[in-house]
Design a protein with these regions (language model features):
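Glycine-rich flexible loops
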Residues: 1-181
Length: 181
């Protein structure tokens, strides 16, 4: 999906050295191994790393996410819509939403977002949903998601996918597999 939501500036085009990158690679492999990738059009994994977050860029092969496909987001200004990043690839359009969720709620350190119609159909009526459809990556979508997350740790994003949050990747992983498998 083409990014119309923000402008990106790179502090470095080199791969991030964040020690948490292996967690994103591991969860991608586990989701692939469990057969979930057939129901998913795209997957976004993000982890808090101090004031920064790490997030995967393009979705290609869930089981084969590489270190170079993971970006370290240094900062994001939602007013100016400027993203400051480290890494060799382009950020996903959903990156600002993940950034703002991580920074709006201190207890959220991990997010897994799975997009696709099959995953939506599996979870419709089982978890809370956003009220309105919003543009992916937009501030309006972030507000809808945060409003829905007030009462839980998962949200069905209308016509997009499902988002799970938690204090750790392990907690979020358990939610994903409990709700989907």
């Amino acid at each position: 999906m083409r990014n119309l939501c923000f402008q990106t500036f790179y502090t470095s085009k080199e791969e991030s050295n964040c020690p948490l990158i292996t967690e994103i690679v591991r969860i991608g492999k586990r989701i692939e191994k469990q057969g979930l990738s057939k129901d998913v059009r795209s997957a976004i994994f993000s982890l808090r790393y101090g004031h920064r977050i790490i997030i995967n860029s393009d979705y290609n092969d869930l089981g084969g996410i590489k270190r170079g496909e993971i970006l370290e987001i240094v900062d994001y200004d939602p007013v100016k819509k400027i993203l400051l990043t480290i890494g060799p690839t382009q950020p996903r359009v959903e990156t600002p939403v993940h950034w703002m969720i991580h920074h709006a709620r201190n207890e959220i350190n991990a997010i897994i977002q799975l997009n696709g119609n099959k995953i939506i159909k599996k979870l419709e009526g089982k978890i809370p949903s956003t009220e309105k459809e919003q543009i992916p990556g937009s501030f309006e979508l972030t507000k809808e998601v945060l409003k829905t997350l007030r009462t839980g740790k998962s949200v069905l994003i209308k016509n997009q996918g499902v988002l799970f949050v938690g204090e750790s990747f392990k907690e979020v992983e358990e939610q994903v597999f409990k709700n989907i498998i």
